Amino acid sequence: MITVIDVETTYQKNKHNGFDPSPFHPDNKLVSVGLESGFGNEYYFTYHSEKVSEGCFETIQERLDQTTLLVGHNLKFDLMWMLEAGFKYSGKVYDTMLGEYILNKGIRKSLTLQMCCQRRKIGMKDDRIKYYMDEGITFDKIPADLVEEYGRNDVVITKRLFDSQMQDFKLPANKDLIKTAKMMGEFLVVLSDMERNGIYVDLNVLEKVNAEYTAEKAYLTQKISKIVYNKMGDTEINLSSPEQLSWLIYSKKPLDKANWAKIFNIGVDKATGKSKRRPQLSINQFRSLVKNNSEPVYKTSASKCLHCDGKGVIKRIKKDGSPYKNYTKCSECNGDGFIYHKMAKLAGFNQVPKSVYDVSESGFRTDKITLSKLASESEGELREFLDAIVRYNAIDTYLSTFIAGIKDHTDSHGMLHPKFMQAVTATGRLSSRDPNFQNQPRGKTFPIRQVVKSRFTNGKILEIDFSQLE
């Protein structure tokens, strides 16, 4: 028997004001289960403020026991919820979201149930529930009759989507893809087991690593700030701005950025969607174009703006002599509170760009690869600065992406349940989020892997990597 399933659950707000409907959150509950099978369209409430369907657990389990293929949209979510709620199912599965992904053959299209059905013209999701979701009202408190209509409709259109996809798989151009769909279904079950098992994180080690690299980031910030002041005077540089970092390294900036991009043919070709080809120039031609279309950046000395007394804002006066209620940005200092006076000394490191490939839309390239390459070719104070910047950027990413990500999603018992996704990349490779648990730093550069421990006494962690398996 083929059974289509759709579940609704409660959710909690996470630290970033997003929604966490995870079955692993201790406060989340399975609210309802919708089924479409040989027994018709059925709907059961397992937890709701208005009603609970009597004997529903036994009935739902009976349906699952008779099911030979379980179908759902984003089925891994539904399957994990059912298993975590105590239901049992070990049969075959089919996810219509993965089916659509496979049939798209690498072309990026939205895989929501709404968009999949809309493209195939086989029905629409009931969006009346959106008002309650926007208000932060969870499914257990939304009127039960509305939840039931919404859930029954989801099951119906998921079944239509399944039938439509099965017809597509019969087409000569898609016949071989059914094997891929079966494999992806088997993999979905494995991933659901992995996510349910989770990973044990040693929170004490995580805090120690976090403190160590937070301290190094603070040290590098101080070191970089000192170098920037020596090179730029009172001009502040936002190191996250490629344009401002370019001023510091190359001591020059474009006179007209639009014209600059045109001269060096920077941007994307609208016809091909690829980067435009840079002009072929001799070194002398290149240097001449840079010189004629850029201006030097000079060190500055700042003094307090007298117009606003260094506050950056003023209160304008009405014709009757009374002040306006709200403050206005000071036009003399543009809200900065300081007036910057250009000095006669050139700012920055005055690095010389070598070719058109060093040029960017806002000046000169300062991406990670360029900075690392430039550091290896430099010496003295420039080398010291570039090494510090490269290390600072790496630590910043490490702290915000890996440490903070793991910290935010690990529960008080040290269990982490990353989400593994099969239908995000164009190539079919796996991806993960909440947190990103792929591409963890290797070797001794960053010891993030120290925090992952076996949950068993005297247990070991085995790491296996299949090189280019796909």
Describe each model-derived feature in a short phrase:
Residues 21-26:
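Short consensus segments that form the blades of beta-propeller domains
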Residues 1-9, 13, 27-34, 119, ...:
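Conserved "right-hand" nucleotidyltransferase catalytic core of DNA-directed polymerases
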Residues 12-16, 44-46:
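Cytochrome P450 core scaffold surrounding the K-helix E-X-X-R motif
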